[in-house]
Amino acid sequence: MGRIIGIDLGTTNSCVAVLDGDKARVLENAEGDRTTPSIIAYTADETLVGQSAKRQAVTNPTNTVFAIKRLIGRRFKDDEVQRDVDIMPFKIISADNGDAWVEAQGRKMAPPQISAEILKKMKKTAEDFLGEEVTEAVITVPAYFNDSQRQATKDAGRIAGLEVKRIINEPTAAALAYGIDKKQGDNIVAVYDLGGGTFDISIIEIDSVDGEQTFEVLATNGDTHLGGEDFDNRMIKYLADEFKKEQGLDLRNDPLAMQRLKEAAEKAKIELSSTTQTEVNLPYITADATGPKHLVVKITRAKLESLVEDLIKRSLEPLKVALADADLSVSDINEVILVGGQTRMPKVREEVSAFFGKELRQDVNPDEAVAIGAAVQAGVLSGDVKDVLLLDVTPLSLGIETMGSVMTKLIEKNTTIPTKASQTFSTADDNQSAVTIHVLQGERKQSSGNKSLGQFNLEGIEAAPRGMPQIEVAFDIDADGILHVSATDKKTGKAQNITIKASSGLSDEEVEAMVRDAEAHADEDAKFEELVQARNQADGMVHGTKKQIEEAGEALPADEKEKIEAAMANVETAVKGNDKEAIEKSTQELMEASAKLMEIAQAKAQAQQGQPEGEAKAAKQDDDVVDAEFEEVKDDKK
């Protein structure tokens, strides 16, 4: 059995970890970084992921996709999506089924398909480290993700060629990372997770009894559309407004300028965590008839705090709800752990510390804790980590729509999963032969105020007066927090059951098509990499040969030189094309044509080998000069 890896699929950055011995280890990607920007760029020739995508974002803003996690499992008409439509430089569109999709380079793509590119990069990072193929993973999601968003994340894993063994909530993963090596007794921990695009709070009890650790989630709450991106957007708006005030030009109409502004705003926000004032300086940000314009704005930490004050306050409301749901008060919390890059902001730390009335833990890396926890959970599933029991909860209530458009709950929020629940319902009309089971997720009494997860029909009910037929509806939530529903007519035994797919979401056929597409692209990517290597080798050969011709000078016969130059011209022509075999063939021919040149170069090198040695001896005899000093004398001063 292969290794199961742990992946933190983040809004802004992603991270992968694996169990190395008895410790989880965060892996460095090909660029040497422990986290990878969750950015994907589409060009005419290739798909870029991570740092390479981020670097070219300024020149390719409409085809560079970031914060895709904010769209995963969402409908285009959702208020949160509509807010992003107005501010994102890339195009967010409505799919045929009403989902929010993205259009780049003329291709329409589902968020799971785009997220899969990041997961593929994480998979490759792990494979490079382990030296073996990886096919299984534990992937983290915000605790407050609904069923559709969890399903979409599993779909992304499948498209990336990963079997998702478990979906685990991010705060729970962070608690695992924090508590796994602390074997003290009972401890109630609050995990405040403010990431790039989502916010969660989880209250978790860590018990240690007879060597076994139990991590039990008592309550969870959050906001899946609150995070560092929102903080950045406040800064971007402020800078754009200041520029408009000063220059009379609105940068919002210029995608290139807005991309530069986004990068500068993010950088300034980060700087203001360690300094009290910074300057945003963007020369040549735009131009008008009078010439180029430059943006220069000084911003203080106090100004930034005033811009985002309401966002920080917004994150405190779910804390109150989670404590109430867990039936605890602030004084019952033993430790407070901060997770997510945005928690580095001093004002966030200050407000959270004031809310709980205690010092915050400083020994948890906010960027890596979630991936480490995912790797620990992967170890639990593979049997490498023993004596750890994880009891997570469903974040939102689940139920069905009943008469009068009322939501009747079958499973209350914060119920430990996996779990089952059933209830008996009846018909609303005489002689009704079918019922529609409309599955909902949320806390509102009115059906329309909740998230519709899907619906199905139970047909063939025997004719009877209303209220007589007995229809049992059973809900079953698995360990990933994904719902399976069945409805059974107790009299006839007729049953209908489904795994809830979002009323939108991708069908199995669509996911399979995307898996095939990803596999095809993997072959393409491998071929492209081989082509680039062949080109690089050819370029290096031409460069080296030219240098050797210069060094050989008159020693190289004219006919040999002509032959080599013709071979070099062939290589230079081949490199411009896309035929790897042609490039390799011309490189080989150049190598053969350069045989005489190699002989001359070797003879020259051998002739020169004895020379410096003799000179050095003479120098030693003539003068007692230290070697290092001798080497530092410049030729023109000898």
UniProtKB/Swiss-Prot annotation:
Biased composition (Acidic residues): 624-638
Extent of Low complexity compositional bias: 601-613
Residue stretches of biased makeup (Basic and acidic residues): 614-623
Induction info: By stress conditions e.g. heat shock.
Entry's Gene Ontology molecular function annotations: ATP binding; ATP-dependent protein folding chaperone; unfolded protein binding
UniProtKB keywords: ATP-binding, Chaperone, Nucleotide-binding, Phosphoprotein, Stress response
Residues carrying Phosphothreonine: T198
HAMAP family reported in the protein's UniProt record: DnaK (MF_00332)
Protein family (similarity comment): Belongs to the heat shock protein 70 family.
Function noted in UniProt: Acts as a chaperone.
UniProt protein name: Chaperone protein DnaK
Native species: Shewanella pealeana (strain ATCC 700345 / ANG-SQ1)
